[in-house]
Design a protein with these regions (language model features):
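Bacterial Sec signal peptide processing site at the extreme N-terminus
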Residues: 11-46
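Loop/turn-rich, solvent-exposed surfaces of beta-rich toroidal or solenoidal domains
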Residues: 333-343, 349, 353-392
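Sec-dependent signal peptide recognition
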Residues: 2-8
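A short helix->beta-strand "capping" segment at the edge of beta-propeller domains
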Residues: 40-59, 82-100, 137
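Extracytoplasmic beta-rich repeat domains
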Residues: 63-64, 89-108, 132-156, 178-196, ...
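WD40 beta-propeller blade core
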Residues: 124, 169, 209, 254, ...
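Structural signature of WD-repeat beta-propellers
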Residues: 111, 118-119, 127, 156, ...
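Short loop/turn segments that connect beta-strands within beta-propeller blades
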Residues: 127-131, 172-176, 212-216, 258-261, ...
Length: 432
């Protein structure tokens, strides 16, 4: 009798708790699993609340050194000589550049002359009175339709050029005649840097290329990890001693021996998921004071890296893809939201934060972002996406002037020989 009772109980349990797909227990478990899908968001920006900080702090800029250099291999321009009258004194005109969402190329200054390009890739040299000295085009009819964007660097009596359609060449600076011309496999996406008899440039495949100035032949190339999408920002490089240090579309910082092209060190700053995110990932230019490299990105990271070892000195929570400026022991940068940060260079401490967009109404402010800035003497000159120029006294928290300088997109301010220049779609405007 007892055995019969045990068998009946066992049969009842197995009938209600079966292991088939219709079992209630397992159906509930499936619901629990289905309720937690394995979904991963790519490019999740950290959200941080930014507020003004230390507004009553006056900076001691009495020991600030004025820099007269327009170009250098460290991108370290510091404070430049400019009094800031902001009176328009000249306009260098050229055919408008189409399909622009940013102006991240700049003119070449040779003594008192300016060299730039138009929408068909013609290179133009102007004198100090805005008169054209010569204009030359070294592109075929088909290439002109691609509207190449050019980057320049000056070397002795030559101008070295790299462009957005994979050409690089050298021309005579005095008349624009072609010295030599070559093609790369992929378009270029960086500024040009030169060192002794070589020059360096990065292409869209994240490859650093070294060429000989004499004839354009390749010395070596160093490919780094590629991304799945095309970057929307320009890459950057600096040269210090016997090393070239550059970034790429996925946030890697790589130091390379100039002579051999071998890697000295490499620092990944982003996770592997960045491979799918590079169109939205933006970073500033690299800037160096000789011992460290500084840069920031739009993922709330401002880095200081040791130049010799590639180790991280510090990281600050700042959201910016604008090139920082170093003056003495201070670093200045502007966040994507329009806040001016003053940072202690050696430790990364933020010592003051000022809202430069406070005069914008909230609705308007959402659609405005900073383009770039320069420091002239003790003032900051910032251009915005709405064509306005903001002038800020760096010693205190006061905004000196807000001026409309363009009806559409404009470049960051460029200071050369006590004048300020702004590149627009069809002209370069000069201010004293």
């Amino acid at each position: 009798m007892n055995k019969l009772i045990i068998l009946l109980i066992a049969f009842f349990l197995f009938n209600n708790c079966s292991f088939n797909e219709n079992s209630r227990i397992w159906k509930d478990k499936d619901k629990e699993l289905l309720g937690e899908p394995n979904i991963k968001k790519v490019f999740v920006k950290k959200k941080s609340v930014v507020r003004e900080f230390n507004q009553n702090l006056n900076l001691d800029l009495s020991g600030i050194k004025t820099n007269f250099k327009y170009m250098n291999n460290r991108n370290d321009f510091g404070s430049q000589s400019y009094k800031g009258e902001l009176k328009k004194i000249g306009s260098y005109k050229f055919s408008k550049l189409d399909e622009l969402n940013q102006i991240n190329f700049k003119p070449l200054f040779i003594e008192n002359d300016i060299v730039f390009f138009n929408k068909k890739g013609s290179i133009i040299r102007y004198d100090e009175n805005q008169k054209i000295l010569w204009e030359k085009n070294h592109y075929s009819k088909a290439e002109k339709k691609l509207q190449p964007k050019l980057d320049f660097i000056f070397y002795k009596d030559s101008i070295l050029v790299s462009d957005s359609i994979a050409k690089y060449y050298s021309i005579n600076a005095n008349n624009g005649d072609l010295n030599w011309s070559k093609n790369n496999t992929y378009p270029f996406n960086s500024e040009i840097k030169k060192y002794k008899n070589k020059f360096f440039v990065i292409d869209y495949k994240n490859t650093l290329r070294c060429y000989k100035i004499k004839d354009g032949s390749e010395c070596w190339n160093l490919p780094t990890e590629d991304s799945f999408t095309i970057s929307n920002s320009k890459y950057s490089l600096v040269i210090l001693d016997d090393m070239v240090v550059f970034n790429n579309s996925i946030g890697d910082i790589t130091a390379v021996d100039i002579e051999s092209g071998l890697i000295v060190w490499q620092l990944p700053t982003q996770s592997t998921s960045i491979l799918n995110e590079t169109y939205d990932f933006k970073t500033s230019k690299l800037v160096s004071d000789g011992s460290s490299i500084f840069f920031s990105n739009n993922k709330n990271e401002f880095y200081s890296i040791d130049i010799k070892t590639g180790t991280t000195n510090w990281i600050s929570d700042i959201n910016s893809n604008i090139t920082p400026v170093i003056t003495g022991n201070l670093i200045f940068t502007v966040s994507d939201e329009g806040y001016l940060y003053v940072i202690e260079k050696n430790k990364g401490n933020i010592i003051r934060v000022t809202d430069l967009f406070k005069n914008y109404k909230p609705k308007k402010r959402k659609n405005v972002y900073p383009i770039g800035f320069a420091i002239g003497n003790k003032n900051l000159y910032l251009t915005n996406s709405d064509g306005k120029l903001i002038v800020k006294d760096l010693q205190n928290a006061s905004i000196l002037k807000i001026e409309k300088v363009s009806s559409n997109i404009v470049s960051k301010p460029l200071i050369f020989k006590n004048n300020l220049y702004l590149v627009r779609s069809g002209s370069i405007i000069q201010y004293n």
